[in-house]
A protein has these predicted regions:
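Membrane-interface segments at loop-to-transmembrane junctions
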Residues: 122-126, 157-169
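Short, highly charged, low-complexity non-transmembrane loops/tails of multi-pass membrane proteins
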Residues: 224-244
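Interfacial/capping segments of alpha-helical transmembrane domains
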Residues: 28-54, 98-99
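Extracellular/periplasmic helix-loop-helix junctions in multi-pass membrane proteins
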Residues: 183-201
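Alpha-helical transmembrane segments and their helix-start/interface "positive-inside/aromatic belt" motifs
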Residues: 4-22
Length: 244
C-alpha cells in the first residue's frame, strides 16, 4: 500500500520537491554572492564557527548510534508535522517547508561564500537526497489533505477527508522506515572516512532505489487498483477511493 499511495500522490509531492529545491538553490546563490547580506544577518563569529567547526562537526559530535536515533526522531517529527498539519488547509505545512528551505539554502550560501561549497555538498548529499525526498512526500501528502478540505469535490467534506486520510496514514507509516534508512546513512556514512564520491554514490544508489520502488512497484500497484487505502472491511461505511 505504501508505494501505491506515494505514487498516487506524486502529482503533489513532485512539484513540491521541484519548487523547494529551486528555492533552496536561489537562497543559496543569493547568500553566497552577497556577503554583505550574510554579515547583516549573522554575526561574523557565528559565521566563522559554522564554517570552521559546527557544520562539519555536527555529523560526528555524538556516537553514531545515538546520532542516528536522534536524527531519525527529529526527521520523523518534521515529516509527521508536514503531513498531519495539512489538515489546517496546508498552511503550517508550507511554513515548515519554508523553514527547511531557509536552513538548507542559507547554510549552503554561507559555506559557499567562504569557499566551502564542496564540503557542504559532500556532507549534505549522502543522506540528504533520501531525507529531503521523504520530507517532500510528507509535505505533498499534507497539502493534498489540505486541498481536500478546501475542495472536496462531489463528496461530503468529511467523507473526502476520510478517503484521503487513510492512504496518508499508510504514507506516514512507510516514511518512518524511509527516514530510518536516511538516519543510518547520516550517522554512519556522511561522517565516515570514505571518499566523497563513495559517500555520495551510496546516497544516490539508495535514492534511486527508493524512486524505482515508488515509480516501479507503486505504479504497477496503482494501475492494478491499489490505492493505499485500508482493507474494505475496515472502512466502516466510508465510500470507496477511486485510483487516479
Amino acid at each position: 500500500t505504501f508505494p501505491a499511495a506515494v505514487y498516487r500522490g506524486a502529482r503533489w509531492w513532485v512539484p513540491v520537491a521541484l519548487v523547494n529545491i529551486a528555492v533552496m538553490f536561489a537562497l543559496g546563490i543569493w547568500m553566497g554572492t552577497h556577503p554583505h547580506v550574510i554579515s547583516s544577518l549573522v554575526p561574523s563569529g557565528a559565521v566563522r564557527q559554522l564554517v570552521e567547526h559546527d557544520f562539519k562537526n555536527y555529523y560526528s559530535a555524538h556516537p553514531a548510534t545515538d546520532f542516528a536515533a536522534r536524527v531519525w526522531t527529529n526527521n520523523a517529527l518534521v515529516a509527521a508535522g508536514s503531513l498531519a498539519l495539512g489538515i489546517f488547509l496546508g498552511l503550517p505545512t508550507l511554513y515548515l517547508l519554508w523553514v527547511n528551505c531557509v536552513n538548507v539554502g542559507v547554510s549552503g550560501g554561507i559555506l559557499a561564500a567562504n569557499g566551502k561549497l564542496g564540503e557542504f555538498f559532500a556532507l549534505i548529499l549522502p543522506h540528504g537526497m533520501l531525507e529531503l525526498t521523504a520530507v517532500f512526500v510528507a509535505a505533498g501528502t499534507g497539502l493534498r489533505i489540505g486541498w481536500t478540505i478546501i475542495d472536496p469535490g462531489p463528496r461530503k467534506r468529511a467523507d473526502a477527508l476520510a478517503a484521503e486520510g487513510r492512504p496518508a496514514f499508510a504514507v506516514a507509516l512507510g516514511l518512518v522506515g524511509v527516514l530510518l534508512v536516511s538516519g543510518v546513512i547520516e550517522a554512519f556514512v556522511t561522517p565516515s572516512p570514505l571518499p566523497t564520491w563513495a559517500r555520495i554514490t551510496i546516497g544516490a544508489i539508495v535514492e534511486i532505489a527508493f524512486l524505482a520502488y515508488i515509480f516501479g512497484l507503486g505504479r504497477r500497484a496503482a494501475r492494478a487498483g491499489e490505492t493505499g487505502d485500508v482493507d474494505e472491511w475496515l472502512r466502516a461505511d466510508a465510500p470507496p477511493v477511486a485510483a487516479n
